[in-house]
């Protein structure tokens, strides 16, 4: 990762980040549930300018028999960045990164999905990054968790995600693209606070042992807030469907 000083970019000044946030501040977060009527479950999640749409179909019988698992449902995840999601031109064909992140998101969700209740079926999760400004994988995990809940898939708990970065020696929560580009480290984390499980933990860059422990604690505090927002989005959706009755 290139240092911001070498690039002439100042990302931390007087304790505030380039967009005015304090180190532990999230970007403005917006969540909507049930926005695609042809899907069994759907959600739109926004962290600042990063926008991810999730759609869930299933449980359903697979078209190809090799997807069948005798004791549980197969969870299939497709992460895709829309060609217009970044400033650079992008091929519509799946890239190596998209294939890798599809696997990352699937593995972050599998610990909470009660797939054993639907043997010999598949649950498909489609994730479309509509706009990318950092933190797309953790936003995708969050959107997928919401869409699974909206589809009525039994889950042990909701999963939320956030990335912690190290910028000019300062640990910060919910990094955007500029911070990711010029930061010294980036640590995406996903967790299910209600059952005390971490389902995703990656690190790009170098942190000391103390920095790692601090960054993880910061991530988990932020994820607590993200999951509470998920619960509120689900509650609001059910109230709207039920005509506003508690």
From Swiss-Prot:
InterPro entries: ExoRNase_PH_dom1, ExoRNase_PH_dom2, ExoRNase_PH_dom2_sf, PNPase/RNase_PH_dom_sf, Ribosomal_Su5_D2-typ_SF, RNase_PH, Rrp41. Pfam families: RNase_PH, RNase_PH_C. Its main location: cytoplasm. Its EC number is 3.1.13.-. Keywords: Cytoplasm, Exonuclease, Exosome, Hydrolase, Nuclease. CDD domains: RNase_PH_archRRP41. One of its GO terms (biological process) is gene expression. It comes from the Archaea. GO terms for molecular function: 3'-5'-RNA exonuclease activity; RNA binding. One of its GO terms (cellular component) is cytoplasmic exosome (RNase complex). It is found in: Cytoplasm. The keyword S-adenosyl-L-methionine does not apply. The keyword Transport does not apply. Catalytic component of the exosome, which is a complex involved in RNA degradation. Has 3'->5' exoribonuclease activity. Can also synthesize heteromeric RNA-tails. NCBIfam families: ECX1. PANTHER family: EXOSOME COMPLEX COMPONENT (PTHR11953), EXOSOME COMPLEX COMPONENT RRP41 (PTHR11953:SF0). Component of the archaeal exosome complex. Forms a hexameric ring-like arrangement composed of 3 Rrp41-Rrp42 heterodimers. The hexameric ring associates with a trimer of Rrp4 and/or Csl4 subunits. Belongs to the RNase PH family. Rrp41 subfamily. This is Exosome complex component Rrp41. It comes from Aeropyrum pernix (strain ATCC 700893 / DSM 11879 / JCM 9820 / NBRC 100138 / K1).
């Amino acid at each position: 990762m290139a240092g911001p000083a070498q690039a002439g970019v100042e990302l931390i000044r007087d304790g505030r980040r380039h967009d005015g946030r304090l180190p532990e501040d999230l970007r403005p977060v917006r969540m909507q549930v049930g926005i695609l009527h042809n899907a069994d479950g759907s959600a739109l999640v926004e962290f600042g300018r990063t926008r991810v749409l999730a759609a869930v179909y299933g449980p359903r019988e697979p078209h190809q028999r090799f997807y069948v698992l005798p004791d549980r449902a197969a969870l299939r995840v497709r992460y895709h960045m829309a060609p217009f999601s970044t400033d650079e031109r992008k091929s519509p064909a799946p890239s190596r990164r998209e294939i890798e992140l599809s696997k990352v998101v699937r593995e972050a969700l599998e610990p909470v999905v009660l797939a054993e209740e639907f043997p010999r079926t598949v649950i498909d999760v489609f994730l479309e990054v509509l706009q990318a400004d950092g933190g797309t994988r953790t936003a995708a995990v969050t959107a997928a968790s919401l869409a699974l809940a909206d589809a009525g898939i039994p889950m042990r708990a909701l999963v939320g995600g956030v990335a912690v970065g190290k910028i000019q020696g300062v640990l910060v929560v919910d990094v955007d693209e500029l911070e990711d580009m010029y930061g010294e480290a980036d640590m995406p984390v996903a967790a299910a606070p209600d059952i005390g499980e971490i389902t995703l933990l990656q690190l790009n860059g170098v942190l000391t042992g103390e920095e790692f422990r601090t960054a993880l604690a910061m991530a988990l505090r932020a994820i607590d807030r993200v999951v509470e927002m998920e619960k509120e989005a689900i509650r609001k959706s059910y109230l709207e469907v039920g005509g506003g009755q508690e």
